[in-house]
């Protein structure tokens, strides 16, 4: 039997009919804050408001619903960093199927609990592997041994067609409001979303520039399409943007992206954190890291989009509240507002007051101070964190720190030391 490896607009139209009474038609909203900030019209496609707070339900339900009754009776499996797993779990409960869902051990607890909530007694969750790719290998082995049906999170034409329904929905909504998009920004993990969206847009909105956005620490599609012209596996990835941190994209999604995507943007994980906080404080939107990628990319494209009409897909809103401290820290580091040093501190009365008076600026704040006094030595090691009001004050701060202790270590520039703090 020949395995289908291409996706057409007809496939997406058929998927749209299957999903019509299953998924929520999420809002397409003109965002006034972003529009003013970038001097253009910025629309947000709010898939963070989907039933499972992610677009992944579209692809999961479509891929499962096309299985034969015999195949469905054998049960389904999947590997996912969270959102695809929720889509599979939701579908398993809806269609009363047995599902075994494999998730990396690094998956935020919030996402694990949501999978269990949506799937209830129909779903068994297995936490395994440090990355999605390790988790995937375990899932495929289990699927083969138990003769079940693996629901691929991105490298499957039915999954891609389901994700593509988002594009059809967007274009129908924009047509009602007489809106034409000049640019579309969407996140790339394994490539299912960008493949489905771009397939539909290239036929029905061919003048729209499709921009794929990846975290800089996991830019597997860019490395495959632009750098190597073949699918490659990244040896190491930053797993912070867990919904888009994939070491290897799909063979099918690679071919579609290569044909349809106009440009790729890599966004620093710290910039993503700043966007998450900005979206929450300015727009009351709770976006997960992968969900904020598309908006983060606007800063890279600000000169191109001025005066244009832009749409950003907010792909998910499953953010674990326990990650907020790390998100704030990464944002402050990226914005050059928070700085850590290791100092040799004099062990004498008044040394701390001297440091505060001589080193800190009038608006600087100490956010961390760890010190263990050793009576047998003249100095003790101090780890100190200093938060600035303006990142332009950093040069003067470093000069004052160097004068206080010429042997100091600036932790921000040492990834290994910094990882011990965050």
Swiss-Prot record:
| Single biological process term from Gene Ontology | L-serine catabolic process
Q: Which GO terms describe its molecular function?
A: L-serine ammonia-lyase activity; pyridoxal phosphate binding; threonine deaminase activity
Cofactors named for this entry: pyridoxal 5'-phosphate
Give residues where N6-(pyridoxal phosphate)lysine occurs. Answer: 56
The answer on whether this UniProt entry bears the keyword Lyase reads: yes
Where pyridoxal 5'-phosphate is bound, by residue? 83, 189-193, 315
Recorded hits in InterPro entries, A to Z, give: ACT-like_dom_sf, IlvA, Ser/Thr_Dehydratase, Ser/Thr_deHydtase_PyrdxlP-BS, TD_ACT-like, TD_ACT-like_sf, TrpB-like_PALP, TrpB-like_PALP_sf
The portions of this protein that span the membrane are none
List each copy of the ACT-like domain by range. Answer: 339-413
- Which top-level group of life is the source organism from? Bacteria
Q: Which CDD domains match?
A: ACT_ThrD-I_2, Thr-dehyd
Q: Look up the EC number in the record and give it.
A: 4.3.1.19
| Swiss-Prot/TrEMBL catalytic activity | L-threonine = 2-oxobutanoate + NH4(+)
Q: Does the keyword Lyase apply?
A: yes
What exactly does this protein do? Catalyzes the anaerobic formation of alpha-ketobutyrate and ammonia from threonine in a two-step reaction. The first step involved a dehydration of threonine and a production of enamine intermediates (aminocrotonate), which tautomerizes to its imine form (iminobutyrate). Both intermediates are unstable and short-lived. The second step is the nonenzymatic hydrolysis of the enamine/imine intermediates to form 2-ketobutyrate and free ammonia. In the low water environment of the cell, the second step is accelerated by RidA.
Family, per the entry? Belongs to the serine/threonine dehydratase family.
Subunit comment for this entry?
Homotetramer.
Q: Kindly provide the name given to this protein in its UniProt entry.
A: L-threonine dehydratase biosynthetic IlvA
Q: Which organism is it from?
A: Staphylococcus aureus (strain N315)
